[in-house]
Amino acid sequence: MSSQYSNVENLSPQTIRQVMKELQDMETTPPEGIKVLINESDVTDIQALIDGPAGTPYAVGIFRVKLTLSKDFPQTPPKAYFLTKIFHPNVAANGEICVNTLKKDWKPDLGIKHILLTIKCLLIVPNPESALNEEAGKMLLERYDDYSQRARMMTEIHAQPVKCGVSDAKDDDGPSNKKHAGLDKKLQDKKKEKLLKEKKRMLKRL
């Protein structure tokens, strides 16, 4: 990966070791509902999958987040982004996350795990008073049912886990199996496309 997109060469060896150790610890013993994705060639590229917490409009989704470490990390906080589209008061249109832990409440010893847990907590308890998405913040405060419906619909459209197809056709290279597998996939794609169009149409009405 080009250093143009990375701060790895600007971090001290001690910081790199510390970050890598924490990521490996989280991979071995993951926090509940969080799976860290390690890029061993660039520890400044930190991504994780967060399960939408039960009892929230995000419950059925899996959300991909990214942390970008600055060259002064851990003295300065990283920037955090949702790579998965989400309707949330504290998430901007470009995915940037607004949370006090990454601003005025930042402390150098908090660590990556604490940041990811804080982001997960933000899905449970949004903070509309410091909204980056003003529409979502206002809707949450004034029309919670509409907010919940909109957030749930965005989750169903954008945050669904990728389901692997049945592997039988892959194991059997017979032309018949290949043909049926192709037809099944086309039918599934059409159904999915139709469902997405219906949901997007409903979103526009909100």
UniProtKB/Swiss-Prot annotation:
Q: From the Swiss-Prot or TrEMBL record, what is one GO molecular function term? A: ubiquitin conjugating enzyme activity
Q: Which UniProt keywords apply?
A: ATP-binding, Cell cycle, Cell division, Nucleotide-binding, Transferase, Ubl conjugation pathway
Q: So what EC number does this one have?
A: 2.3.2.23
Give the protein's recorded name: Ubiquitin-conjugating enzyme E2 S
Basic and acidic residues biased stretches: 168-191
Question: Where is the region Disordered?
Answer: 165-191
Catalytic residues (positions): 98 (glycyl thioester intermediate)
InterPro entries documented for this protein: Ub_conjugating_enzyme, UBQ-conjugat_E2_core, UBQ-conjugating_AS, UBQ-conjugating_enzyme/RWD
Please give the function described in this protein's UniProt entry.
Catalyzes the covalent attachment of ubiquitin to other proteins. Acts as an essential factor of the anaphase promoting complex/cyclosome (APC/C), a cell cycle-regulated ubiquitin ligase that controls progression through mitosis. Acts by specifically elongating polyubiquitin chains initiated by the E2 enzyme vih/UbcH10 on APC/C substrates, enhancing the degradation of APC/C substrates by the proteasome and promoting mitotic exit.
Family of the protein in this entry: Belongs to the ubiquitin-conjugating enzyme family.
- UniProt domain UBC core: residue ranges: 14-160
Q: Do you know which CDD domains this protein is assigned to? A: UBCc_UBE2S
Q: Which Pfam families match?
A: UQ_con (PF00179)
Instruction: Give any single GO term for biological process.
Output: exit from mitosis
Q: Which reaction does it catalyse?
A: S-ubiquitinyl-[E1 ubiquitin-activating enzyme]-L-cysteine + [E2 ubiquitin-conjugating enzyme]-L-cysteine = [E1 ubiquitin-activating enzyme]-L-cysteine + S-ubiquitinyl-[E2 ubiquitin-conjugating enzyme]-L-cysteine
What's the domain of life for this entry? Answer: Eukaryota
Q: Which SUPFAM superfamilies did the record assign?
A: UBC-like (SSF54495)
**Pathway terms, separated by semicolons:** Protein modification; protein ubiquitination
Identify the SMART domains for this entry: UBCc
